[in-house]
Amino acid sequence: THTQSSAASDVYKRQPYYLNLKKNLDATLEPRYISKRGFGISNEFRYLTNTFNGAINSSILTNDEEYKDNYNKNSFRWSFNLIHSQTFNKNSFLEIKYANVSDTFFLNDFGGDFNGTSKTLYAPQQFIISNFSDKHKAVLKVNAFKIVNPLGVNQFQELPKLELSWFEKNKFFNYGINSFLSFYRKGGAFN
């Protein structure tokens, strides 16, 4: 589907191309032209197997003249978003959510239309590995948030968070121990 729109002084053209690479593996490439901002491309790559699945979305804008003129900064702009889930066995799992952008104005300027992510105040950067059974739960999480709102403050990292739980059930009552240990660091995203 070819899309073309025009505001009072801006022309926006895009043409998506869908590629079915093989069973459970596909990609969409979408070259774009925005008259005030230049040429760019967005893509989405999706994969699915019996033990893992995910999607990678990315966008680049090679020479954003409007951004360069307004902020006197590098005009190469980009975004990246990875979501991955994996099952190692019936009790062990991995989840990765990683998003990043070239600058705090990227989502404000392009929103979710440019790379498949919705407008948000932060880009999540999470790594979670977990193991469960009838008697325990163990979760290791590394967590950070990159603030992508120009007015955003209070970025932090959780390096790491470890949750351990043990529980026992019998006829008359249930009991257990829940614990977690977490270290916080003020700062932004993982670079």
Over which residues does each language-model region extend?
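Outer-membrane beta-barrel proteins and related beta-barrel translocases across Gram-negative bacteria
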Residues: 5-191
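Short, well-ordered junction/capping motifs at the entry into regular secondary structure
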Residues: 1-2
